[in-house]
Amino acid sequence: VGGGTTLINENELLKTLELCKKLFNIKEISCESDPNHIIPEKLSMFKGIIDRLSCGIQSFDDEILKKIARYNKFGSSKQLQEKISKALGILPIFSLDLIFNFPSQTEEQLLNDLKIAKNLAPQQITTYPLMKSNLTKDNIAKSLGVETKDNEFKYYQIIRNFFKDYQQNNGWSFSLEKNQLNDEYVSSHHEYLGVGSGAFSFLDGELLINAFDLNDYAKMIQEKQNANIAKASFTRKEIIKYIFLTEMFAGKIQIDKFNQTLNCDLEKELFKELLGLKISNAIKKENGALITSEFGQYLFVVLMKDFYTGMDLVRAVFRDSKRLKNKDFINIMKENISSI
């Protein structure tokens, strides 16, 4: 359950999740929240309902928190640590989300973030690389400064080494213990259905996009209309590439299982791509599986980062009501999107 602050109205969320579990065979529920909505009394309402809660902290460095306008909004490093400590142990999995590779972030600042996160001992720690696009790069430069050196690969190596005693779930997620709940649903589910305004679905080789405007979405639902306002169709090879990316992000693909699921021959369909990855020592074939190397794991983090950055550009198009009203058809790949 995404959208940033899904716990902002706990009573409504609880009713919604209980209805979903009643109507559908839902086995696991993961929710997002922020540091202002992890009060123990409120979290206790969701025992037996929410299996994992992800909380965006971004950093424990006060100077960085001030630069990204989170210090006054969510509290200082000390206050954040106190909030998290009280929130732990209520729901099965609490995921603490950090961001690394801020412009001007030092190795010392990164290690301090990692040490604090580890000392708090949440069940899961997720470390996202800073995601920049044409939409956000100017604002990032304005608030955090211009990047003189990109430390992403170096910092990623530090992170992996720091959490070598943890279970690595995928490219950027680490757990105290092995768990089956994947924090990136796109890598564990080839198809998914999005419900709600602005939600994405991927079904039968098509990306479907729901209306972003809440009033438009509500009207469509009330009138029992299809809430999809756009879709994009993918070729068979594009689908194979997409699923290959999302599965390799988790570090390993069983070739026979992949072929059986997609009714394809992976090594034939993506011969050139696999050859390039093998030559660059990003992946290797071992016992019928494709496995990422340390460099390969980072490479797929970069690719997944670009995937999410691209989805942000799609969101920007469909949030622009003027653009939507003036066009009968939108080609996402050809839209000129100005920075904000």
Regions found by a protein language model. Give the residues of each.
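Charged, E/D/K/R/S-rich low-complexity terminal regions of large eukaryotic assembly subunits
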Residues: S201-I340
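C-terminal scaffold of the Radical SAM
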Residues: G2-C264
